[in-house]
Every structure is written in structure tokens, then in C-alpha cells.
Regions:
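Bacterial N-terminal signal peptides that target proteins for export
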Residues: 1-10
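C-terminal motif of bacterial Sec signal peptides marking the signal peptidase cleavage site
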Residues: 18-22
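A composition-driven surface/loop motif
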Residues: 6-7, 24-641
């Protein structure tokens, strides 16, 4: 949240003078102990979780946030047991080797500084010079079986027709260029023979390159790269990308891919990158490098994909702009339909997922960590983000966990356009805004937890509409907010909302159809429970406050379908809460005892306020409520707009 100088400092001084001053599991969900083999609980959590509040004082956060504050991401090559349905009709069927037949076979065996071939097929010529192997083919239905080891060779394929490339325990190192270079625009069915280990390594320079041929990666193809098989492939790229296609790339269940790239992107596709399944691990260390990148679509349907990037940002003189690393970079669309995606970026300006157009999550598990700071070059800068789209973002299902701790600009989930959340379990814990949209934000379902340790929990730079789901937004102290939509329309028509921060945006009375209570107070401590009960004392829910609000007060916004207009509700602090269902400190169906009363509110209006610790009142923008401040205008203590 950006503020004009002078306004909030003055308000903070007035309010300070007048005041007396995570996540475990829901009933059917277990967010943090999913057994994916990718959470090692590193020792950095102490540094990451001791971020300073806006006032400069240290803040601590309670254990109710579970693994959100300390989960780690690391390379995991453990195989997965996955089922697969092979399509037999439509355009997709052509990409599956099971729907093709390659009966003519050519064997190529590398041995040290030499290579040999066997199997004669009309239309296929194999030329060998030492361990440099060049295949030229006009034949159809050919399978090339490749095995053996060389530390000074390569395989190049020219083919007029689609073919099978069977990697059957091969290790190729080419000090002068690509290890495998496919100069064919036809489909290449790349089979990792079951149980085999295959390794490709390039050199630090590509002196084998010619002016009329591309050589863009350690494993490069002009055509489609369609992977299958239950073997492994390790690619070590020292000059350019690891795996690259000038068409599209497809990975399937059973594939076990590892790419380490030190000078470029790990895996790059021009048209699209499809992950149907398998285990994909990539590491990049070059400046502004990408783990998985496509000029078009990136679509993940299954498997487990892990991306680690460590490079810093860089200035691009051609674009006259700066960019950082990204675990996933889609120049058009990113879609997640299933499987697991883990991204960790530690360099300046690094991002987890970056999408230039539409970003959609339908299902699956996404975990993102960024720890780098903002990258600057002169007056240009790029900030770390967990998930970022320049176009619209739709979060419809699955589980998303994002932690960004690198300082200013480290936002969790950001859309430069509209954001729509309709399902799933979404948790963001970030230094800057946890969830942010430049245009309208709509939340109609799902479980959402958003915590900005030095800024807002949820920040819409346009309208904000909540009609369903559980939405918890935690901002830091003055002038930051739990819910922030500047002075735009804020509609509450359903769902459970809990917002806490130094201040809050006010729901708009004319479009709000579910009662909202706003309370201002002087002090509340990390780990204390705020409880809400009806006038008979029956608990509606409890909320475990995730940080201290002790210096400049706090503002609490609450709304629930169980809180209806005309009825009274008891707000208490410091109760003992046991049992029940817990989502990031929001607890239902629990046993609640003790605590001291904060306020009893009768929800006589759509917006009811209480300044229970003597905060100032407002000027009539919203109706006053029980216990309202002087003037009865409905501005709760702690400061808000």
C-alpha cells in the first residue's frame, strides 16, 4: 500500500495519543504434511520470520501458521508411481509413441573416442568421425538406439520424417557444442529406456556451430520433443540451455529428468511446454535465467516439478529493461491442472512463476519461496514475486503456498490485471503485500490466508468483492491494512472475512449485503485468540492473532454468514481454545473457555463499528455502531479509511 507523505504519519500520531495503549489443517485438508519429499524444514526460518514491522520493531509469528513460515524446497529425484491414460483419438494422440510404430532400427554405440553403428535401413546414412555421429534420413518409421559413453563426441540427426530416439544408457559429452542436435522439424519421440541412466553434457563454448544451423542447447531439436519411458536423463548445460525445442516439449509419467544449467535456461520451448507427469528437477544459476520457459503455453497436468534458481537479475540492452530469474516463465499462458510444482528463487529480483498473460490454477500443489531482494539498474528495477501474471489470474482449486521474504517489493501472488479466487487453499506469507491485484479482485470461494509482514494482507488497487470462502488478511501496523482497496468499492456479500492490521478499508454500505463488524484496539499480542460468540455464548469461531500489534493499535474486520443483522455478538480476547478445525489460526467447532470481553455488538447496520479502547470516531462515511467513537461516525480506533 503506497500512501501520500504527511497523511498517515499525522493520523498515526493522533491515534497513538488517543489509544490506551497459521496453518494446520481444516476438517478435510492437510496443507503442510503432504509427504511429497520436498519439505526439509531448513534452518533459515529464524531469519525469514523475524521481519520488522513498519515501525521498525521486530515481529514474531505464531505456530498456527505451520509450515508456511519454514517449509523448504530442494531437488528430489525420487520416482513417482503414476497412472496414465493414452489418448487414441484427436490431435493429442499423435504425440504418444504408443500410437506409432518404428520398426526399422539403427543402433549407435559410443565408446571413448570412437563410435560404431549397426543395422541397415534404406534411406538412412550414418557418418562417423571419431565419436562425432551424423545421421541423415529420408526413411519412415526409424528407431535409433543409442548407448555407450564418450567424452568428446556428439549425435546430430537430420530426418525428413518423425522418428524414435531410444536413449539406452548413453553418456555424451561434447566440449565444443551440443551433445544431441536434432536438425529436423518433425516429431522426435525420445524414449528413456526403462531403468537406464542417460547423461548429456556440453562445453563452455560452441565452436561446432555453423551459420546455417541452430545449436541452442545441450539437447536441442528444431521439432517437437516428446519424452516417454521410465529411465532417467541428466543434462549439464554449460554454454546455453539444457533442453530446448523450437516447437514444443512434452514430458510424461515415468520420465525422470534433471537439468543443471549454468549459462542459460534449463528447459525452453518455443510454442509450448507440457508436463503430463514424471519427475522434473532443474537448477539454473545464470543471471535472469529461467527454469522452465516457453514463448507460448506452460501447462502442468501431473508429476512433480522442482525448480531452483540462484542467479541475480540483469539489464537487457536490446530491451532496455531489467529482468530476474524465474522458476516458470510463460510468455502467454500458464495453466496448472494437477501434480506438484515447487519453485525456489534466491537471487535478486527472482520469481517463482511469471506469466505475461493468463494464469490459471485448477488443481494441484504449488509451493514457492523467494528470498532475493529487489534488483536495480540505474532507475530500473524488478522485484521478487511468488506468482505474477501481467494478465488475469484465476485460482480455482488446489493448494498454493507462497513465501517471499526478500524485502521491499517481495509480493506473494500478484496480478497486473484482475484476480479471481473461487476455490482451493491459498496461503501467502510475504514481506510486502501477500495478495495484490492492479484491477478488480473477486473472491467467491476457497480458503485464503494472506499475511504481509511489512505491508498489506490483501491489496486491490481497484474494487474488492468477497462473496464466499474463508478469507484471512493480516497486514502489519500503521498505516498498512488487512484488507486494502484504497477508496474503491469494497463489497461483502458472503463468506467469512477476518482482517487485521493497523487499519482497514471500509466495506461499501450500498453494495454490502452481509453484516460486517469493525473493531479498533490499542494492543494485542501474537498468539492471543480473538473469539466471537452469539448472545447465548455459543462459539462461532476463534482467530489466533499471528503477530504483535502493540505500538500503534490494530483494527479488526470480521464478517461471517453466521453473524446476522439485528443480532448481538460477543467479542473476547485471550480465551483458551482446544480442538476444532484450524486453518491458519481460524478455528471452528472448538472448545472455548475464559478470555476477557472486548465488546458486545448488535449488528443493527450492515457496517457496525466499535472503538472499545477509546479510539477516535469518524465523519459519517459509514454508520456508527455500538461503542462507536466520539462523533458516532464509524471510524474505528487504529485508523482507517
Amino acid at each position: 500500500m503506497k500512501r501520500l507523505f504527511g497523511f498517515y504519519p499525522m493520523m498515526a500520531m493522533i491515534i497513538a495519543a488517543m489509544l490506551t495503549s497459521g496453518c494446520s489443517s481444516d476438517s478435510d485438508l492437510d496443507f503442510f504434511n503432504q509427504g511429497n519429499g520436498n519439505e526439509t524444514g531448513n534452518g533459515n526460518s529464524g531469519n525469514e520470520n523475524s521481519g520488522n514491522g513498519s515501525s521498525g520493531s521486530a515481529a514474531t509469528y505464531n505456530s498456527s501458521l505451520g509450515d508456511l513460515t519454514d517449509f523448504d524446497i530442494s531437488i528430489d529425484k525420487t520416482a513417482l508411481s503414476e497412472s496414465e491414460t493414452i489418448p487414441t483419438e484427436g490431435d493429442e494422440a499423435e504425440d504418444f509413441i504408443e500410437n506409432n510404430s518404428f520398426k526399422s532400427e539403427v543402433d549407435i554405440a559410443f565408446k571413448g573416442s570412437s563410435a560404431s553403428t549397426s543395422g541397415s535401413v534404406d534411406g538412412v546414412t550414418v557418418t562417423i568421425n571419431g565419436a562425432d555421429v551424423v545421421v541423415k534420413s529420408s526413411a519412415k518409421k526409424v528407431c535409433y538406439n543409442v548407448s555407450g559413453t564418450t567424452t568428446n563426441g556428439f549425435l546430430k540427426i537430420y530426418s525428413d520424417n518423425k522418428f524414435e530416439l531410444n536413449l539406452n544408457g548413453v553418456s555424451i559429452t561434447n566440449p565444443d557444442g551440443a551433445a544431441i542436435n536434432i536438425q529436423s522439424k518433425k516429431r522426435g519421440y525420445i524414449v528413456l529406456a526403462d531403468g537406464t541412466e542417460n547423461t548429456l553434457t556440453d562445453g563452455t563454448r560452441y565452436s561446432d556451430a555453423t551459420d546455417d544451423e541452430d545449436m541452442k542447447a545441450c539437447f536441442f531439436s528444431e521439432g517437437k520433443m516428446l519424452f516417454s519411458g521410465k529411465g532417467s536423463l541428466s543434462v549439464y548445460a554449460n554454454c546455453k540451455a539444457g533442453i530446448r525445442s523450437d516447437d514444443y516439449v512434452l514430458f510424461r509419467p515415468g520420465n525422470n529428468i534433471y537439468v543443471k544449467a549454468t549459462a542459460g535456461n534449463a528447459i525452453k520451448a518455443n510454442d509450448a511446454l507440457y508436463i503430463k507427469g514424471g519427475v522434473i528437477n532443474v537448477e539454473t544459476s545464470a543471471a535472469a535465467s529461467k527454469g522452465l520457459s516457453s514463448d507460448g503455453l506452460v501447462q502442468i497436468d501431473g508429476g512433480r516439478t522442482t525448480v531452483l534458481t540462484t542467479g541475480t537479475g540483469e539489464y537487457d540492452s536490446d530491451e532496455q529493461d531489467v529482468s530476474g530469474c524465474a522458476g516458470i516463465k510463460a510468455d502467454s499462458i500458464f495453466v496448472m491442472n494437477g501434480g506438484a510444482l515447487f519453485c525456489k528463487s534466491t537471487g535478486a529480483g527472482g520469481k517463482g512463476i511469471s506469466c505475461d498473460q493468463l494464469l490459471t490454477v485448477n488443481d494441484g500443489t504449488i509451493k514457492v519461496i523467494t528470498t532475493g531482494k529487489q534488483f536495480t539498474y540505474g532507475r530500473l528495477d524488478t522485484s521478487p514475486k511468488g506468482m505474477k501474471s501481467d494478465g488475469a489470474m484465476y485460482l480455482k482449486g488446489g493448494t498454493i503456498m507462497v513465501r517471499c521474504t526478500g524485502g521491499e517489493g517481495s509480493e506473494g501472488i500478484e496480478s497486473k490485471s484482475t484476480m479471481n479466487i473461487s476455490g482451493g487453499n491459498i496461503m501467502a506469507y510475504c514481506y510486502d503485500d501477500a495478495i495484490n491485484s492492479s484491477k478488480a479482485m473477486t473472491i467467491s470461494g476457497g480458503n485464503v490466508f494472506a499475511m504481509g509482514t511489512n505491508n498489506d494482507g490483501i491489496d486491490s488497487n481497484s474494487t474488492l468483492t468477497v462473496s464466499g470462502g474463508v478469507v484471512i488478511a493480516c497486514g502489519t501496523t500503521q498505516p498498512e491494512e488487512g484488507f486494502d482497496c484504497d477508496q474503491n468499492t469494497f463489497a461483502v456479500t458472503g463468506g467469512t472475512l477476518i482482517g487485521i492490521g493497523g487499519t482497514t478499508s471500509t466495506p461499501t454500505t450500498s453494495v454490502t449485503t452481509q453484516p460486517v463488524a469493525i473493531l479498533g484496539g490499542s494492543s494485542i499480542q501474537n498468539g492471543q485468540y480473538i473469539t466471537v460468540a452469539d448472545d447465548s455464548g455459543s462459539s462461532i469461531f476463534a482467530f489466533k492473532v499471528p503477530r504483535d500489534y502493540t505500538q500503534q493499535g490494530y483494527t479488526l474486520l470480521v464478517s461471517s454468514p453466521k453473524m446476522t443483522k439485528g443480532n448481538s455478538y460477543i467479542f473476547s480476547l485471550g480465551a483458551t481454545v482446544s480442538g476444532g478445525n484450524d486453518f491458519c489460526g481460524y478455528v471452528t467447532d472448538a472448545t472455548v473457555s475464559g478470555g476477557s470481553s472486548l465488546a458486545t455488538l448488535t449488528l443493527s447496520q450492515m457496517i457496525t463499528t466499535s472503538n472499545f479502547s477509546g479510539g477516535i470516531g469518524g465523519g459519517g462515511m459509514q454508520p456508527g455502531g455500538n461503542g462507536g467513537g466520539p462523533g458516532g461516525g464509524g471510524q474505528p480506533g487504529g485508523g482507517w479509511h
